[in-house]
Amino acid sequence: MNLSYTDEQNLLKDSVSKFCTSDYEFETRMKSVNSDSGHSDDHWRLFAELGWLAIPFPEEMGGLNGSDVDLSLMFEEFGKSIVVEPYLANVVLAGGILRRSDLDSKSEHIEALVSGEKQFSLANYEPNKGFNLDNVSCEIGEDGKVSGVKTTVLNAQNADSFIVFG
């Protein structure tokens, strides 16, 4: 069993590491944290330009068809510099739900996410429910109106669209 990284994975790791060590010093990160969005819009655009937002999505949706190992390499480097951009909330969580959805417009939404044009937020957590989606109190009416409470909606302040479990 070969547990070595591929050449592409080593390039990805080096690319993320270089960003984290050259463009993400403490003062820059604190400026981002204290901004209205809680992250750097310039860094988010750079993530899109570098193809990082496309990694977990299939090629037919504008993605790079990356693997969980690719994501883990990125998160290892992100963790070293405490990267605050909403990659987990936007790309992995909300993007993962979009990718697996049966929405007619999912490709359009994912292409907007991959390009950095749109951000999404997953609203699935409810008070006293933990991560259990089998017992959701929130209701979504036929008119699309949401009735109920969601908590810990990651990336809510930046979201162009919300994915709500009801």
Report each predicted region and the residues it spans.
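Amphipathic, small/basic residue-rich leader segments at the start of a protein or domain
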Residues: 1-88, 108, 112
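Short glycine/proline-enriched turns and hinge-like loops at secondary-structure junctions
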Residues: 66-67, 132-134, 155-159
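Conserved protein kinase catalytic domain
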Residues: 72-75, 95-98, 163
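N-terminal glycine-rich flavin-associated loop
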Residues: 83-104
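Short beta-strand-to-turn element immediately C-terminal to the catalytic PLP-Schiff-base lysine
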Residues: 98-102, 141, 164-166
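A short, Trp-centered hydrophobic/proline-enriched beta-strand micro-motif
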Residues: 116-127
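Cytochrome P450 C-terminal beta-domain/meander region
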Residues: 132-147
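A short core secondary-structure module
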Residues: 147-166
